[in-house]
């Protein structure tokens, strides 16, 4: 978790001519001791409406707090950092932000301790858990089971929407295909095989920490979804990426459910992060806690190829081993709704 502190702000816009205040609220952050008033100036530039800072608060781990607020209000999110909030909803959102900030303050010493432990190599010791750790683990397993159920439902909704949008670029306001733009890269394996001495002269070793935390949790339930008779293509039809289907009530309801689930997923992930921090602190320098978690932190030596130096020294060879990977395609369900939902209010 990024513990960098900052300020969370809530902004509205006011029309200079009519004095009307927008129904939309921007929830954003500032870092590096910048005030919300100074950030307000960034948004004011070129904006014909007056920016008003309604509320703000200071918190550690400000990026985590902002992410939580955006996800928990996904059902109210219109686009980007803008949310459709009534005065009552805005008040509730600010109270939630205060609650989450206090939660971060409470757990900050433990989170800072985790950062310290993460920077040290683990021993071969395995700790025997006491009753407190066993209780924490039970809470973790309950959280993990619900989180997996939410993730599985989100995956199912995504697959249903993708099936609905087959042979098109997506569904207006709800989902679309995202096409990557791969950068050219050097085929190092082929270069090493063909020119081992040249490759070796631009390769160095660097030492880093290899770390992975895993905790024992329930197995994910097996899905019983039947496989279709004909598999859908993994990639979208490239000649129809600009063609979008119109929404209907069914897909809007699915999208609304998706947004509500995002809020719950975020809440559960928030809880999981703090539970895992407790486990890591309890683990300390040891590599594991018997039956609960494993957190080995080992020294790893990796090879690093100096691509820039190689290209400058051998431009012709570099060109012959440079290629551009094929683009990848991802079907993305919007985490906001730029249209009027029949259902409203944060869940």
Predicted feature locations:
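Conserved catalytic/binding loops enriched for acidic/polar residues
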Residues: 293-296, 300
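Non-catalytic accessory segments flanking enzymatic or RNA/DNA-binding domains
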Residues: 1-167, 174, 188-250, 263, ...
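Extended, charge-rich alpha-helical scaffold/interaction domains
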Residues: 182-186
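Protruding loop/beta-arch "assembly-hinge" segments enriched in small, turn-prone residues
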Residues: 206-216, 321-347
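N-terminal targeting/anchoring "stem" of glycan-biosynthesis enzymes
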Residues: 15-17, 313-316, 320
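Polyanion-binding surface elements
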Residues: 139, 257-258
